[in-house]
Amino acid sequence: MKKRQLWLLVLMVAVSLSLTGPAFAGKLQNQLVKESTLEQILKRGVLRVGMDTFVPWAMKDKTGKFVGFEIDVAKQLAEDMGVKVEFVPTKWAGIIPALLTGKFDVIIGGMGIRTKRAMKVNFTIPYDYSGMSMVASKAKADGFSSLEDFNKSEVELAIKMGTTAVMAAKKFMPKAKRRLFEDQAQAYQELRNGNVHAVVGSSPRPAFEAAKYSETLFMPMRDNFTKEPIAFALRKGDFDTMVFFNGWIQTKRDQGWLQDKHHYWFGTRDWAHLVE
């Protein structure tokens, strides 16, 4: 008798779930859509982009406006979405916490995909690739031509804090001293002042510096010594926004738009007159 009552109860619960399940799932789906970053952007009419200044990813021109590869990417994304774009300059060391607290909608700032970062944020498919290189002082690093030459306790490297350049320096030149700076420009100024042996940074900025200050600086190695995928970063749990961003990136890649923009900003100096 008790077994019969138990089975009857199970049957009633199953029937109840079958009737209410679709409705509940529909409500849950609607709630998720309402709370998605994509929906918030469309309602607000503004795409808020977190970024920091890195030449030539993002920098200010002579009039004080932001220009650069990432700036073009974010502007085109906003245009295709039918919204305006708002850039939120943020110190790199605190850019992920700022995203997580809702200061902006997405990071479009040359952020490399890293395991520790991926534990805090979700990354889209890559829209670009970058790599680490070095520019060195002729006075302090004359004759240096390999990572081994810089992997010495007396060598000092200037690096922007919070960047993948810090990890690259630790991995490939663990013996060298690392001097960290909040701003990329400060690191390069320290190199030009002759206070460090080299700057470790994302290509192509080191090559630009070596060409601009060829009397005092040089490239110890012709090629990058790392390669890393670059992606948008967004808050976890936002599936709709992730799918949209991935689709947009793939479309722009298939159209050749991303490749054209990459060549302009990284393969030429046609933009130099905007900032110099």
Regions found by a protein language model. Give the residues of each.
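Periplasmic-binding protein-like
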Residues: Y129-A136, S203, A207-Q250, T268-E276
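A ligand-binding cleft/hinge motif common to bilobed small-molecule-binding domains
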Residues: G94-P97, G110-M119, A168-K171, R192-N193, ...
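Acidic, polar ligand-binding/catalytic clefts
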Residues: K75, E79, K84-D149, L217-M219, ...
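Short helix-initiation/N-cap motifs at beta->coil->alpha
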Residues: E35, I71, E86-P97, D142-F144, ...
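Extracytoplasmic small-molecule ligand-binding "clamshell" domains
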Residues: G26-G110, M119
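Bilobed "Venus flytrap"/periplasmic-binding protein-like clamshell domains
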Residues: R48, D52-P56, F66-E79, S133-Q186, ...
